[in-house]
Swiss-Prot record:
Pfam families: RNase_H. It is found in: Cytoplasm. This is Ribonuclease H. The gene is rnhA. Mg(2+) 2 binds at residues 10, 135. The keyword Cytoplasm applies. Keywords: Cytoplasm, Endonuclease, Hydrolase, Magnesium, Metal-binding, Nuclease. Belongs to the RNase H family. One of its GO terms (molecular function) is magnesium ion binding. GO terms for biological process: DNA replication, removal of RNA primer.
Length: 146
C-alpha cells in the first residue's frame, strides 16, 4: 500500500527576476520534514515549480501525494489541462508562443507519473500555517544567501 503524503510548497523571489528561494513541508503521519533551497538568478514561477519538484524528488518510493500550493501557475497547469495541451502542441501555448520553464515542467511530468499527485490551490499569505511556513522557508533561503 502506498504511503499518503501531504506536501505544501511555496516559492519567493527578491525581484522578479532576481534571487529566489523555495520551501516545502512534507507530512507523513505525525512526521514533518522541512526542505528549502536557493537560486541566485531566477523568477517566482521557477521557484514555485522548483519547490514542487524538490518535494516530490525527496520521496524515496511512489506515494499518494496531496500537494498544496498558492501558485495558480502550477496548480492550473495541472488541474486545468494546460500541461497536457502544451505537450500535445510541442510545448507551445494556445497563442503559439513557447512555453516558459519547459525544463521544470518536464521534471514535473516525470514525477507525476511516478507518484499519484493531486494538486490543490491554497490562498497565499493568509491564515494557512503550512503555506505560511513554506513562505518563511523560501524567504529565509534568500536571506541566508545575501
Amino acid at each position: 500500500m502506498q504511503k499518503k503524503i501531504i506536501v505544501y510548497t511555496d516559492g519567493a523571489c527578491s525581484g522578479n527576476p532576481g534571487k529566489g528561494g523555495w520551501g516545502a513541508l512534507l507530512m507523513y503521519g505525525a512526521s514533518t520534514r522541512e526542505i528549502s533551497g536557493y537560486s541566485p538568478a531566477t523568477t517566482n514561477n521557477r521557484m514555485e515549480l522548483s519547490a514542487a519538484i524538490e518535494a516530490l524528488e525527496t520521496l524515496k518510493e511512489p506515494c499518494i501525494v496531496h500537494l498544496y500550493s498558492d501558485s495558480s501557475y502550477l496548480v492550473n497547469a495541472i488541474n486545468e489541462g494546460w500541461l497536457k495541451r502544451w505537450t500535445a502542441n510541442n510545448w507551445k501555448t494556445a497563442a503559439k508562443k513557447s512555453v516558459e520553464n519547459i525544463d521544470l515542467w518536464q521534471k514535473i511530468l516525470t514525477l507525476i507519473k511516478l507518484h499519484d499527485v493531486t494538486f490543490h490551490k491554497v490562498k497565499g499569505h493568509s491564515d494557512n500555517p503550512y503555506n505560511n511556513r513554506c513562505d518563511e522557508l523560501a524567504r529565509q533561503a534568500i536571506k541566508n544567501n545575501r
